[in-house]
């Protein structure tokens, strides 16, 4: 049996918890057990499993593990006057926190936007919470796909590894939200969406939309890779 790897941003938490467990065992067995459990939970929270990624640049994959909470048409967050479809995904404490690039293309911008730390499940979190917003110009069709990592009550540390001007590959790791929260992805209105509210999605694996209007062509003879 193999165990999933750990994301590098999890090691400080795991090492600190492990050190506390060693000190705890030196003081009392019960205290040591408590910190050992915390160490195991940290390792679980920061797990980074291999994913089976579709090798098709015409697809849009889920950027995170979680549950689709809403699919609505809204004004573009880029304030360009366009209408887009926003797909919101809620990440619980028990979901994988590592985020994945939703579409292949070139990163046009990465912006940190300060804000509040409301519950990720609340309506105010959509527009008011602190976030990191990345814009990717898709290699197929030249669409601007916007993806947002949103902070929450517990998730107050967002890490985004994307860099403006660099290429981004569908399914590759793009960062992490510590201890669960929410992600939004904005795609052009009218683009075929493959999920519905309430669906459980897997980051980098679950196909949520297509850049090609002909879904039959897009899904024909798909190949995959493990990343």
UniProtKB/Swiss-Prot annotation:
Q: Name one GO biological process term.
A: phosphatidylethanolamine biosynthetic process
Q: Where is this site: Cleavage (non-hydrolytic)?
A: 180-181
Instruction: Name any one GO molecular function.
Output: phosphatidylserine decarboxylase activity
By what name is this protein known?
A: Phosphatidylserine decarboxylase proenzyme
Instruction: Return any one Pfam family short name.
Output: PS_Dcarbxylase
* Disulfide cross-links: none
Q: Which residues carry this modification: Pyruvic acid (Ser)?
A: 181
Q: Which family does it belong to?
A: Belongs to the phosphatidylserine decarboxylase family. PSD-A subfamily.
Q: Which domain of life is it from?
A: Bacteria
Q: What pathway is it annotated to? A: Phospholipid metabolism; phosphatidylethanolamine biosynthesis; phosphatidylethanolamine from CDP-diacylglycerol: step 2/2
Its gene? psd
Q: Which NCBIfam families match?
A: PRK05305.2-4
Q: Where in the cell is it found?
A: Cell membrane
Q: Which InterPro entries match?
A: PS_Dcarbxylase, PSD-A
Q: Which UniProt keywords apply?
A: Cell membrane, Decarboxylase, Lipid biosynthesis, Lipid metabolism, Lyase, Membrane, Phospholipid biosynthesis, Phospholipid metabolism, Pyruvate, Zymogen
Cited HAMAP family:
PS_decarb_PSD_A
Free-text function comment from the UniProt entry: Catalyzes the formation of phosphatidylethanolamine (PtdEtn) from phosphatidylserine (PtdSer).
Cite the post-translational modification comment.
Answer: Is synthesized initially as an inactive proenzyme. Formation of the active enzyme involves a self-maturation process in which the active site pyruvoyl group is generated from an internal serine residue via an autocatalytic post-translational modification. Two non-identical subunits are generated from the proenzyme in this reaction, and the pyruvate is formed at the N-terminus of the alpha chain, which is derived from the carboxyl end of the proenzyme.
| Active-site residues per Swiss-Prot or TrEMBL entry | 181 (schiff-base intermediate with substrate)
């Amino acid at each position: 049996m193999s165990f999933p790897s750990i994301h590098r941003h999890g090691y400080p938490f795991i090492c600190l918890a492990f050190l506390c467990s060693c000190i705890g065992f030196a003081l009392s067995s019960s205290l040591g057990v408590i910190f050992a459990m915390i160490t195991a939970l940290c390792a679980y929270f920061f797990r980074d499993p291999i994913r089976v990624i579709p090798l098709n640049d015409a697809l849009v994959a889920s950027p995170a593990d979680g549950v689709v909470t809403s699919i609505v048409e809204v004004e573009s967050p880029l304030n360009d006057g366009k209408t887009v479809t926003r797909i919101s995904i809620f990440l619980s404490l028990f979901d994988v926190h590592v985020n994945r690039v939703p579409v292949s293309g070139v990163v046009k911008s990465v912006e940190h936007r300060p804000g509040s730390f409301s519950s990720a499940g609340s309506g105010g979190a959509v527009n008011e919470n602190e976030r990191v917003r990345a814009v990717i110009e898709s290699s197929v069709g030249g669409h601007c796909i916007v993806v947002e990592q949103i902070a929450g009550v517990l998730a107050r540390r967002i890490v985004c590894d994307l860099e403006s001007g660099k290429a981004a590959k569908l399914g590759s790791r793009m960062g992490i939200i510590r201890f669960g929260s929410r992600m939004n992805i904005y795609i052009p209105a009218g683009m075929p969406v493959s999920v519905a509210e309430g669906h459980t999605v897997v980051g980098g694996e679950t196909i949520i939309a297509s850049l090609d209007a002909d879904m039959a062509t897009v899904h024909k003879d798909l190949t995959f890779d493990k990343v």
